Amino acid sequence: LLNQKTAKYIPVHYVLSNYPHYEPSYYPHKPAVPVNNQYMPYPYYAKPVAVRPHVQIPQWQVLPNTYTPTVVRHPHLPASFIVIPPKKIQDKTGNPTINTIATAEPTLTPTTEPIVNTVVTTEASSEFTITSTPETTTVPVTSTMV
């Protein structure tokens, strides 16, 4: 709109009264001013709905010379985007001294226990296996005979 030249508004009745030969009687009345003129009412034509969007284009806006915000605003991201460093890396760097001390005590204690438990578990499992097999055999035979 800024680059377009606007025609001066001339009343239609003034043109018709002074220059009658412009409008013969067998033509319908049409205004002498262009239809897209913003100063002319639209009695005979439908007003155009939207030739251009009414939103200003950012290039045309006059911007101030100074930077208006005084405080730099950082965007607040949702919790899913916040990166939290994994604790495993921190534990690996901090635990080697603790792990060497801690592994000395459990190594001695479990080493003694599994040997005893393994022997006992093996004997117990073999006894239970042998015992359970005859009992299982005995119970079905007894229940079948009774």
Curated annotation (Swiss-Prot):
UniProt-annotated location(s): Secreted
Lineage top rank: taxon: Eukaryota
Annotated S-S bridges: none
Isomerase as UniProt keyword: no
Pfam family, one: Casein_kappa
Modified residues (Phosphothreonine): T121
Tissue: Mammary gland specific. Secreted in milk.
Keywords, alphabetical: Glycoprotein, Milk protein, Phosphoprotein, Secreted
GO biological process: lactation; protein stabilization
Role description: Kappa-casein stabilizes micelle formation, preventing casein precipitation in milk.
Family: Belongs to the kappa-casein family.
Protein name: Kappa-casein
